[in-house]
Structures are given as C-alpha cells and as structure tokens.
Amino acid sequence: GEGLRAPRCAERSLSYADSFIELIEKNKSNFFVHKINKYPNLLEIEKIFKNYRDKNIDLVLSIGGGSVIDAGKLFSSCKTSGSKLNDISNLKNRSPQNSIFTIAIPTTSGSGAESTKFATIWSEETKQKFSYENENLLPEVVYLIPEYTKSLNYDLTLTTTLDALCHAVDSLLNKNSNHESIRLSKEAIEKTNSNFSLLLENLENIDYRAEALYAS
C-alpha cells in the first residue's frame, strides 16, 4: 500500500523530532510534517486544514507542548480520513467515529493537554481565546518520554510544574469532582510536592522528570 500518511505537528527547532522522522522513513511510510508556532492561532490552524484538505490522513502525531497537542487534536477531530475539512464551530456535534487516530507526545509537564477532551486556540482577529470540548479530542495513545522534557530550563520547568499543580488543585476543588478525579488530583499533588524541589535542583535527572510528567 501507500503506507502511513501522518501530518506531524511539532514545535520549531526540536531536534528530538528527527528520531521520529528517521523511524518513519525507515518504515517507508508517507508522511507530512507541519511545524507550528509556539502559540498557534485560529488562522494557523485553518492553514493546516487547507494544506491537508485533500490528503488521505490515517494518523496524526503531535510532538510538543500543550498548544501543539491541541492543534493536533483539533485537526484530527475536524478532518475525517479521506474527507474534507469540517467547520470547527460544529465540533461539538461530531462523533468519535469521525476523528483520525491520534498519538500525543508531550514535551512539557504542565497543561496535561495530552490527557484531556479539551482544546484551546487563540484568535488573532477577535483577540479571543476559544475552548472546545468533545470526547473525540482525547488522543487514542499518549507516550510519556521524560527525556523529551530535559531541554526545559529552570524557569520553564518551574512554571510548567506549577501549572500542573494548579490544574490538580482546581480539579480537586471542582464542584463536579468525583471519586476518580479526586484520587487523581491528590496523587498529582502528592507527586509534585515530593518531587518539585528535587527536580529544580537536578534538572537533568530523568527520574524526577518522569515523576513531573506523570503528575501533569
């Protein structure tokens, strides 16, 4: 067959993405690479849709931070394999059967975008932030690779870990919380509290990176 067709969303200048390109090339798969800006806006997402409107996509692989992963989630949910683009505004009416298989690989340990059914995008024209919710926004597969977070400097490690902690506290105190969400929130808070200072003092430590990534 023609092999795999996968538009990959990745942040600019990330050398670790080269390993995936090499792997796909060795397997003689057809793929398309699309690098997006750090903070993609609605126009950029629409540009991605336009570029791949007539492509038969079987897989979306997103490697990067929350914005990159959200972009991949929106793309896979609004473009069915073998079909044309569907309007983002109609996303909430889409069924899970109409999404493309998605793999997310986070390179930060903050927002946890890889494990949610939400996606957020900024509109430069209206100066508004849009949030979308749909079950089919949740990636089918997530790989947590702590080595990919080693490039985060002290400040980014600090801010993203605090971001994860804030999400956990917010989930714990949410009026719609349940036994499972409370359990996960407490686990995330405990892991962050026991690991945070150690990670900041040892940014190269893979074990601490792994704990932070899991907590997020």
Annotate each predicted stretch with a short phrase.
Residues S81-H179:
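A glycine/threonine-rich phosphate-anchoring loop and its flanking beta-alpha core
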Residues I57-K73, T107-A113:
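Glycine/serine-rich anion-binding loops at beta->alpha junctions
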Residues R12, N37-P40, N153, T157, ...:
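Catalytic cores of large soluble enzymes that bind and process phosphate-bearing ligands
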Residues F32-H34, L61, A71, A104-I105, ...:
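General beta-strand structural signal in soluble alpha/beta enzymes
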